[in-house]
Amino acid sequence: GYTGKGWAPGDCKERGVNPAGKAFNKKKLTPPYSGISNIDYVENFKLFYQDSDKKQPFCFWVGFNEPHRGFERDSWQKENKSLSIVSVPGFLPNHDVVKGDLLDYSVEIEYQDAQLQKIIDFLKEKGLFDNTLIIVTADNGMAFPNAKATCYDAGVHVPLAICWGDKIKRKNTSEIVSSVDFAPTMLDAAGINR
């Protein structure tokens, strides 16, 4: 199943099945800022879990809409952030308006991180965390000029964090990876050999 943004940008209506599974998007919330989705990712994941067969492994896709353009302007001020903490990338003008936009972007990233933490806390509460493979990544770089939709680093550099309880040793790496490897890796981890 999934919540938020499922499989995209293809058109799965023709096939009649979304590769991400059944949608769990019924639970809504009042977002803290206008650029943030009203989808309650955490409660929708809980609905999926309640609906699932507890004797079977599960796969769930949380397709966060954040951070995407449409950030609420000056949301950073409501979060008591300061322009002085911003380091503007060299491909953008070093201007207070740009710094504010970067901080508005960070507000959405922090919101997404908080939602993910709540899902992790739920997995821990249910005793599922140590046996759940969690992959966090994105489909493109930051939504700024000279970044997203380009082949420069800022357009293709995406986060990647993977945890699986004590089954994967914690480490940081700067090695190049390919998202093409995700599906075979997940199938292998699930013991599916085809």
Task: Outline where the language-model segments fall.
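Long, well-ordered early-domain segments
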Residues: 1-7
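Active-site-proximal cap/lid insertion segments
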Residues: 8-13, 27-39, 48-194
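Short low-complexity, flexible loop/linker segments enriched in glycine and/or proline
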Residues: 15-25
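A short loop-to-beta-strand scaffold at the N-terminal edge of the catalytic core in hydrolase folds
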Residues: 44-45
